[in-house]
Regions:
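Active-site/ligand-binding surface loops and adjacent short beta/alpha elements
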Residues: 182, 188-245
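Mature N-terminal segment immediately following signal peptide/propeptide cleavage
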Residues: 33-50
Length: 245
């Protein structure tokens, strides 16, 4: 709006209708199959949200870790390299970007969502899906179920920004609402795992660098509060290093 005696100049940019249309088509959500929804920035894959149950047939049927849902994988770097892993042999239960706790207390009983043996996350409904010239967004409602009884409402919101020359920002917002009874969440004692987690894809161990606010580190740092942590390596034989923080 016009201002009287403005103290500074303002600049505006006008775009043709065709340019605006091209920007609006920057992102695209596409169904991969009946369990997975993928996001592309133009022709570059960005990530996949697995809303249905993903099953690894190579894991014995008696092992409850052979199936999981409600997580993000793969996540691609800016050069097409895959940054995340799923069903790694050393920890079958790890799955891309996920959120889980080894100690979930309900009605005096403890469940392990980290290993998902007596409690699991399941898709309930879509809340929102959109694309735009700057970012794309997705919102979904899941449930935590003990057998067939839902004990928790889980709402996941993703906002994925268009890539810059050397980075991409992905915002993840998580909300939990107990259905009836109080629920307690606790991580693993003396090990620090539990909560929002990312399982990185295999990279060059010799070239892997972990950086925290105090600088580079080679320590595990259990039970250490960190505002952020960065892992950088050369994934899958890529020509250059990349990573995430």
């Amino acid at each position: 709006p016009p201002q009287a005696a403005a103290s500074e100049s303002r600049r505006f940019r006008l775009e043709t209708a065709e340019t605006a249309k091209q920007n609006a088509e920057l992102f695209a959500w596409r169904d991969i199959d009946n369990t997975s929804l993928g996001l592309w920035e133009r022709e570059q894959p960005v990530l996949v949200y697995n809303h249905g149950e993903v099953v690894n047939e190579n894991i014995p049927a008696s092992d409850h870790r052979r199936a999981r849902g409600c997580y993000i994988h793969p996540v691609w770097g800016l050069n097409g390299e895959i940054l995340t892993d799923d069903f790694p042999r050393d920890h079958y239960h790890h799955h891309g970007i996920f959120w889980a706790w080894p100690h979930v207390g309900i009605d005096g009983q403890e469940h392990d969502l980290w290993m998902y043996d007596t409690i699991k996350q399941r898709f309930v409904r879509w809340l929102h899906r959109d694309t735009g010239p700057v970012a794309s967004s997705l919102a979904v409602e899941n449930g935590w179920f003990v057998d067939d009884r839902q004990v928790m409402i889980e709402r996941v919101s993703l906002r994925i920004f268009k890539a810059s020359d050397d980075a991409r920002v992905i915002d993840i917002s998580l909300t939990w609402i107990p259905m009836a009874q109080a629920i307690t969440l606790q991580g693993a004692e003396d090990k620090s795992y539990g909560g929002l987690t990312i399982r990185f894809a295999p990279g060059s161990r010799q070239e892997t660098v972990i950086t925290v606010p105090d600088g580079r580190t080679e320590q595990d740092l259990p039970d250490t509060p960190l505002a952020w942590a960065d892992l950088t390596t050369r994934f899958g034989g890529a020509e250059s290093a990349s990573g995430a923080a």
